[in-house]
């Protein structure tokens, strides 16, 4: 069952997003995990691509565009949007989903739904609980650098203009979820109804409570 999650960030350090994607982080604190010498630990397996960055580093490209349009200069501005598409762990063995295939799907999703935005697309082979759920991170600069067609989730003319910003409204998020469902149907992958929920669905708060409880039990068993 593929899921879609959205996070908005006011962090002006665009390099932090790429650091998270490339290096190991603690799943509870979200801080980098360091080795015995205090160095960052690279993730063992991932796929990473940039879109609309003109051959530049994602962070540099975003900062250049922000300065050009005089946007994202205030502390309270949302600088980037982070979307995560997580696939069902069974999609690998049952439906032939690979990291490369998921990366291609993520890039296509980004191009179709976030045109005109500088973006990072990165696929990891595993989730927080090591259950094998391949997932794709899509990080976009909130600023749009090119004029784009009026897409179904947009509700005002400014949503198409270069120099204006992406807005993840409730209606937009519902649309993106419906598109994830359509993608899974088209690709023959497992899917649940993301719009109406599931009686077996676990909320983020419940998931992390369970994870922290299990981690505490694991520590006790080692002592």
Q: Predicted regions: what is each one?
A:
Residues 1-223:
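N-terminal nicking endonuclease/strand-transfer module with a His-rich metal-binding environment
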């Amino acid at each position: 069952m593929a899921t879609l999650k959205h996070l908005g960030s006011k962090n002006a350090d665009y390099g932090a997003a790429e650091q998270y994607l490339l290096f190991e982080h603690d799943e509870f604190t979200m801080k980098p995990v360091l080795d015995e010498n205090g160095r960052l630990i690279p993730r063992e397996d991932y796929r990473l691509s940039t879109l609309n960055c003109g051959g530049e580093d994602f962070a540099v490209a975003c900062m250049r565009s922000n300065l050009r349009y005089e946007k994202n200069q205030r502390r309270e501005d949302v600088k980037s949007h982070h979307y995560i598409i997580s696939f069902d762990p069974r999609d690998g063995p049952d439906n032939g989903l690979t990291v490369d295939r998921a990366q291609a799907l993520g890039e296509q999703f980004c191009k179709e739904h976030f045109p005109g935005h500088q973006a990072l697309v990165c696929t990891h082979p595993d989730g927080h609980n090591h259950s094998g759920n391949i997932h794709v991170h899509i990080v976009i600069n909130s600023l749009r650098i090119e004029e784009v067609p009026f897409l179904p989730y947009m509700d005002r003319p400014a949503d198409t203009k270069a120099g204006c910003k992406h807005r993840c409204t409730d209606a937009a998020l519902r649309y993106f979820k419906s598109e994830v469902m359509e993608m899974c149907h088209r690709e023959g992958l497992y899917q649940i109804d993301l719009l109406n929920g599931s009686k077996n669905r676990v909320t983020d708060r419940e998931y992390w409570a369970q994870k922290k409880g299990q981690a505490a039990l694991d520590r006790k068993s080692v002592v």
